[in-house]
């Protein structure tokens, strides 16, 4: 777990409740950790109870108020339970970070099976909409939603084609939801560059690929989970109270134009 100095951050989420999906490792965990350090009661989720339990213990060890819930975002009953359990314990929701994603195939688009196309779309896009349908009635005035997209949404690479297409869709979804949920709820998006997590390990563990990715950035390095958490916390906080419908690309200067 990358360390964030408690002396360097404020308490922008004191008294607030934040749900972060797919948050027991990687970028999702870093986001939950950051929001928790800043005072939020964080609700973390993952498909596996073991992962949830381990992440809860790590966050509690840092003095963070945390609730862990098993949730596969493509399961309607588990989505509803995530929201209902949060509201039952805390009485409200202030922040929702939709981070869950899947990339089960490296096939070219025209060679990808229909069932795989459906799975990637369902988890990466559809689940965010359905989760917010459940959460919306409980969001407080001044609440914030942050969708996690990707730099691949701007130019989907061949090895992540359908994944990239779904991340492009999230850019549009951000705009649509921002208008629909205004004026009481803001909706923004973070598009991370490549970060060496378990999710991206098949790319970043290859030295040649990693070097190529680093060379495409102005800063000549890959991102960290802490980089993504900082940007997400900003957009979710009142510091971004006049920002909605926008995507912040956190990719070290990697070209990001549709």
Curated annotation (Swiss-Prot):
Residues annotated for substrate binding in this entry: 150
Keywords: Oxidoreductase
Top EC class of this enzyme: oxidoreductase
Active-site feature positions: 163 (proton acceptor)
Signal sequence annotation: none
Pfam families: adh_short_C2
Molecular functions (GO terms): oxidoreductase activity
Amino-acid positions noted as binding NAD(+) in the UniProt annotation, renumbered to this chain: 19-43
Residues that span the membrane, as ranges: none
InterPro entries noted in UniProt: NAD(P)-bd_dom_sf (IPR036291), Sc_DH/Rdtase_CS (IPR020904), SDR_fam (IPR002347)
EC number per UniProt: 1.1.1.-
NCBIfam families xref list: PRK07231.1
Family classification: Belongs to the short-chain dehydrogenases/reductases (SDR) family.
Alphabetized PANTHER family for the sequence: DEHYDROGENASE/REDUCTASE (SDR FAMILY) MEMBER 4 (PTHR43943), DEHYDROGENASE_REDUCTASE 4 (PTHR43943:SF2)
Cited function: Has no tropinone reductase activity.
Protein name (database record): Tropinone reductase-like 3
Organism: Erythroxylum coca
Upper classification of the organism: Eukaryota, Viridiplantae, Streptophyta, Embryophyta, Tracheophyta
